[in-house]
Each structure stands twice: as C-alpha cells, then as structure tokens.
Amino acid sequence: MSRKKHESSENNPVWFPTIMFGLMGTGAVWMVLFYISNGALPLPAVGTWNILIAFGIIMAGFAMMSRWK
C-alpha cells in the first residue's frame, strides 16, 4: 500500500509564523514600553488598559500557535 502525502496542503503558509511571532513580539514591546515610560507610551489616553491591549495582542499570537503545523 502506498500512502499519499499532501505536505504542501497540510503545512501553514510561509507568512504564518512571521505573523504569529510578530504579534507576540509586538505585545511584549507594547507592555515594556508602557512600563518603562510610566504610562506615557504607547497610548497614554487609555491608561492601564494598555496592559490588557498588550495581553490581547500576545494571546492572538498564542492562538495562532495552536494552529501552527
């Protein structure tokens, strides 16, 4: 018996890990900027909600990680 492999259809596109790691990195940088600048960056108008925004961006990257093959 021969098995058919469809590796190209099962693997993620090349851009997938780039976006995934980019989201996690962006969220981490967002949080570091918030703490280093004492809330003056990246969005001073939203205050401590910047932490939730950063976690949301990081979690989007982790959600993509669950689909990575």
From Swiss-Prot:
<keyword id="KW-0812">Transmembrane</keyword>
<dbReference type="InterPro" id="IPR009619">
    <property type="entry name" value="CrgA"/>
</dbReference>
<comment type="function">
    <text>Involved in cell division.</text>
</comment>
<keyword id="KW-0131">Cell cycle</keyword>
<dbReference type="Pfam" id="PF06781">
    <property type="entry name" value="CrgA"/>
</dbReference>
<dbReference type="GO" id="GO:0051301">
    <property type="term" value="P:cell division"/>
</dbReference>
<comment type="similarity">
    <text>Belongs to the CrgA family.</text>
</comment>
<keyword id="KW-1003">Cell membrane</keyword>
<feature type="transmembrane region" description="Helical">
    <location>
        <begin position="45"/>
        <end position="65"/>
    </location>
</feature>
<protein>
    <recommendedName>
        <fullName>Cell division protein CrgA</fullName>
    </recommendedName>
</protein>
<dbReference type="GO" id="GO:0005886">
    <property type="term" value="C:plasma membrane"/>
</dbReference>
<keyword id="KW-0132">Cell division</keyword>
<keyword id="KW-0472">Membrane</keyword>
<keyword id="KW-1133">Transmembrane helix</keyword>
<feature type="transmembrane region" description="Helical">
    <location>
        <begin position="14"/>
        <end position="34"/>
    </location>
</feature>
